[in-house]
UniProtKB/Swiss-Prot annotation:
Recorded family membership: Belongs to the UPF0182 family.
Bilayer topology: Multi-pass membrane protein
Pfam assignment, any one: UPF0182
Chain positions covered by the region annotation Disordered: 906-938
Chain ranges passing through the membrane: 17-39, 59-81, 113-135, 169-191, 212-229, 255-277, 284-306
Source organism (scientific name): Mycobacterium tuberculosis (strain ATCC 25618 / H37Rv)
Compartments where located: Cell membrane
Pro residues: bias regions: 912-938
Protein name per the record: UPF0182 protein Rv3193c
Cellular component GO terms, alphabetical: extracellular region; peptidoglycan-based cell wall; plasma membrane
Amino acid sequence: MGMRSAARMPKLTRRSRILIMIALGVIVLLLAGPRLIDAYVDWLWFGELGYRSVFTTMLATRIVVCLVAGVVVGGIVFGGLALAYRTRPVFVPDADNDPVARYRAVVLARLRLVGIGIPAAIGLLAGIVAQSYWARIQLFLHGGDFGVRDPQFGRDLGFYAFELPFYRLMLSYMLVSVFLAFVANLVAHYIFGGIRLSGRTGALSRSARVQLVSLVGVLVLLKAVAYWLDRYELLSHTRGGKPFTGAGYTDINAVLPAKLILMAIALICAAAVFSAIALRDLRIPAIGLVLLLLSSLIVGAGWPLIVEQISVKPNAAQKESEYISRSITATRQAYGLTSDVVTYRNYSGDSPATAQQVAADRATTSNIRLLDPTIVSPAFTQFQQGKNFYYFPDQLSIDRYLDRNGNLRDYVVAARELNPDRLIDNQRDWINRHTVYTHGNGFIASPANTVRGIANDPNQNGGYPEFLVNVVGANGTVVSDGPAPLDQPRIYFGPVISNTSADYAIVGRNGDDREYDYETNIDTKRYTYTGSGGVPLGGWLARSVFAAKFAERNFLFSNVIGSNSKILFNRDPAQRVEAVAPWLTTDSAVYPAIVNKRLVWIVDGYTTLDNYPYSELTSLSSATADSNEVAFNRLVPDKKVSYIRNSVKATVDAYDGTVTLYQQDEKDPVLKAWMQVFPGTVKPKSDIAPELAEHLRYPEDLFKVQRMLLAKYHVNDPVTFFSTSDFWDVPLDPNPTASSYQPPYYIVAKNIAKDDNSASYQLISAMNRFKRDYLAAYISASSDPATYGNLTVLTIPGQVNGPKLANNAITTDPAVSQDLGVIGRDNQNRIRWGNLLTLPVARGGLLYVEPVYASPGASDAASSYPRLIRVAMMYNDKVGYGPTVRDALTGLFGPGAGATATGIAPTEAAVPPSPAANPPPPASGPQPPPVTAAPPVPVGAVTLSPAKVAALQEIQAAIGAARDAQKKGDFAAYGSALQRLDEAITKFNDAG
């Protein structure tokens, strides 16, 4: 018997060691180099924005967490190895057939490498993983109270939001660390002879037994702690088959006691395991572990299953009633749907209305939105693009401004950005791409309630948006013909200009002006960026770093870069906000607005949690999906939340990229915690200027989440909630080309939050009855500064047509389909239905409005820009249809109903040009042919009796005769035609 001699490992030559070190250095450089470059670039970028404290706080937190986790985990594993080695048997039996001997020799030959390298590698891996949880740790350190306690344990919700996730993280790391130490100790004892196996027998040294048993005992103790924490996590747990989130009857009366029992059993088992140290009998801990396993199966799984099947399911509505009430209360609190925010009012939805009542709703009828921002983008591009490299997004935005008469109006708005992907030929050269074509030019707004001219008139090319433009004019001065004055219309930052792989522009004074700005009849004018934004690029260090970052040698050799040069990058507004506020989830919709004569992008930011007790866990991607998101591939990343607040409003200056964060929700505990983590980065709500407040709108994604939850959580009675009989549904988009839910719409209409006739900017949505196509409710979210965030829900008790039924009634009406069939005959024009708006009018009625567009040909090519040709409406079961809002309203309610509707803007016979005071460069490429003139449409109700149809034909003939007489100047014939028209209208009104 003796110690087996260790086999010597072959030694490496000095040359081999040098080559290995060089290879390792190259590998480290390849792995770490890009990260070091990115870190340095981020240091510069955050500093330029004024948010370097965010970068340093995140970096310091990540480094500290990585080091602490690495040292702790690696140290525990090292301890397991070191103990096994230090207590190894002095003499190991020598056996020729010992399979462990060769491994023992290898380990002994490289003892330091194995003993330190393995724990170090494990610690490094653990640290890298742990640093990704930096936010959880910061919330634990800075989180406060919610001021609300959970209904089961009476703990403040801050415990669940900030403390419990941290405790669970620490417990997970301790379990993994001790388990790895156990494995390392076990393997080390086996290699060094503390554990010997021979056939069916084996031997275990005392030190091996003590160490392994101790580690198992610690694991069992940690499992007992896990059972204790499991109790709290039950409150955000979802059991299969439950219609609500949180602990139900089975969880409280079976699972919760089971967790306590299992915790007690785990403590007993831990004592049994530790007893093996003194008793030298491994059967006792083995029995304890088997008992723990069986208990977890019987007590932890079997008993709750029996309670669920025998006691709960036969009486589920009564048994779960208390817990459903908890879920209703918590979900309303977590998603901002409490009674101080949401106001419910009964609304008939089908009350009869007179022409006078409709006309009196001036705030609604004068603001009926005709322009669909998902359809009119090609028209913006055709008439306002100017050059091939300017571009508008496929889906435009809606905002509101005061018109020249001081009336609140909604506008379809867009920034004319530069799209690098549309550069062609020599424009794609590196110098042109990054130093010449650097910015967009112009803010375009179109009143959403009107168009230029009537498409029904064959002598006019009407139906197109009326464009109000802020742009750099032909003489180099800023022309502000838009809805608000703008000092600087050049756009260096935006979602379109940043939508490319090489998102950067090199700007700054270096000799003559280089940047393309605008054209005159004589030459092209250049410009030099003068904004404060941008990272200095003049030094050789900066040039070298950015050359490496973008893999572009021109940074080093191009003479267009001088001492005053700057580089603009990371130009997407939402991404800039997410970078300086990494704790925010941003809304999918970013929109431009003129604020204090500056063009800014407004970004909505959310704080979220995923473990709010009893609050329903919601998938953001599912809740926010609608037909627009699907069509434009703008779905938000999947994220589960059970708490959400629109806590931050952010602005990004379109010229210099300045990011400003404003506190929107002053009560949000999550935001307060982050404001302590990053002090000074979020400005108080009081700093929001009135000019900015006038353009803040209720965020779309939040509204979609809330309407989905209101479909269930408007119910107060838990028994009714359980039966789902009074639930609502988000309606599907009735448009035949849509494939998802109907999106909410921003409109200006009468203020239903105040229940008066003042104009209000709102975000609205209809709600259907559960699995039905009839209306159940109408939801409006106010964006007015005085009532911002108030939700008004009009509950509709009767059987009122929902969006799908209204759309079916409009599109299948014989007169409508016949008229549109003529317009689209032989694929001359492509007919498109716009957004179907639901508008409360009169006192108790709901008016459906759906604009109709046509574009040349049957394709959806970009050149086929659409124009408005008809307006369709439905009120109760009656359909109105005409070239204008006034015509459709008159057809529905009679003469005078459209008196307060906004009239059509004048136009000329030709295609409307860009505003004369501010002509952009002419659009490149040939102009597409105009839409074939639509035939006159019958004005009036289209659900008609034969007598009314005959009367309408007479009306149409009389109108035609009057037009002909007017053109010829035959006043006698004109008077006769008017008399026949009056008689025909009388026949129409008298017809049954």
